[in-house]
A protein has these predicted regions:
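N-terminal nucleotide-binding beta1-loop-alpha1 segment
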Residues: 1-19, 76-77, 275-282
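Conserved N-terminal catalytic core of the sugar/cofactor nucleotidyltransferase
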Residues: 2-5, 13, 27, 31-112, ...
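Conserved alpha/beta core of the MobA/IspD/sugar-nucleotide pyrophosphorylase nucleotidyltransferase superfamily
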Residues: 3, 178-283
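Active-site glycine-centered loops adjacent to acidic/histidine catalytic or metal-binding residues
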Residues: 9, 116, 242
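A structural signal for short hydrophobic beta-strand segments in well-ordered beta-sheet cores
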Residues: 25, 155-158, 229
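Conserved beta-strand termini and adjacent loop/short-helix elements that scaffold enzyme active sites
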Residues: 53, 80-83, 141, 171, ...
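A short, conserved beta-strand element in the Rossmann-like catalytic core
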Residues: 117-120, 236
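Conserved core of the sugar-phosphate nucleotidyltransferase
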Residues: 119-203
Length: 283
């Protein structure tokens, strides 16, 4: 298995913070978003290579970071330049995966991740779930009640008995489920090959966007492959997409840590809930 880390975005909402430095190399509590991923991936022996996909603007930043020993991992690390130089000509998340697959000539199992989130779950737990489902495609997330959060990303309707995803939408106006999905995906080899078919259809359909959730949504909607859902509760996945979130990340992490502690001390109670849009925390 190879892990593909999407780092080709421009993070324009973070202003000067990411003007000359990629978001993946920003630090939270002394560790970059990228290093948080690498630490987790080190716990999965089946991953033999980590492929970092950068845009042309920040490619040298990643090469320099690797040379400076700022990518600590026991995996082979390959850094690719997708050739784009602005937000306007970006390839998009799935487009970057397709680019990487072609570049390295790979057709096997794939783990696709973004490198701009803080999280406290273990990626190895999701991988174990993937294996337990006979290596079936896997997305992750948790139950969500906030309409704002549900409309802002990928939303799954999940069979509670089998964990199979019955519908999946990316940024729906009217959500058809209550499970908000994070941008992290496990695909078997057969599904990895379908990425190229998806990209061919995307070129013909302007309604298919750039976000990574459009591919698993396409898989489910068009009955291309089964997808299963791993619930990370009581753990968290924080999209650090705004300056407010980044500058208040210590408060958010403290609240997340308290919620996990509360959950395990009171597993039958429902009082240990952190609002997923973090608005109450960062006021």
């Amino acid at each position: 298995m190879k892990a593909f880390i999407l780092c080709a975005g421009y993070a324009t909402r973070l202003g000067k913070l990411t003007e000359n430095n990629p978001k993946a190399l920003l630090e939270v509590q002394g560790k970059s978003f990228l290093q948080l991923l690498l630490d987790n991936l080190n716990e999965i022996p089946d991953i033999d290579e980590v492929v970092i996909i950068s845009n042309h603007k920040f490619y040298k930043n990643f090469v320099d970071a690797k040379a400076a020993g700022k990518m600590v991992t026991d995996k082979v690390v390959t850094i690719l330049d997708d050739g784009t130089s602005s937000n306007e000509d970006r390839l998009g998340a799935v487009g970057d995966v397709a680019f990487a697959l072609n570049k390295i000539g790979y057709k096997g199992e794939s783990m696709v991740l973004v490198a701009d989130n803080w999280f406290d779950f273990k990626i190895s737990d999701i991988y174990k779930f993937y294996c337990s489902k006979n290596r079936s495609n896997t997305v992750f997330g948790k139950f969500e009640t906030s309409e704002k959060v549900l409309r802002g990303g990928a939303v799954a309707h999940v069979n509670p008995k089998t964990c199979k995803v019955e519908s999946l939408q990316e940024k729906p106006a009217v959500p058809d489920g209550n499970y908000a999905c994070g941008a992290f995906y496990l695909y078997n080899a057969k599904t990895t090959a379908l990425i190229h078919k998806f990209m061919a259809e995307k070129e013909k359909d302007n309604n298919i966007g750039d976000a990574p959730g459009y591919f698993p949504a396409w898989l489910v909607t068009n009955n291309q492959a089964d997808v299963y859902f791993y619930d990370i509760a009581p753990y968290h996945n924080v999209d650090v997409g705004t300056l407010d979130t980044y500058y208040n990340i210590d408060k958010i992490i403290e609240s997340c840590n308290n919620e996990v502690k509360c959950y395990f001390e009171n597993p039958d109670e429902q009082k240990c809930t952190v609002a997923s849009d973090w608005t109450e925390i960062i006021k």
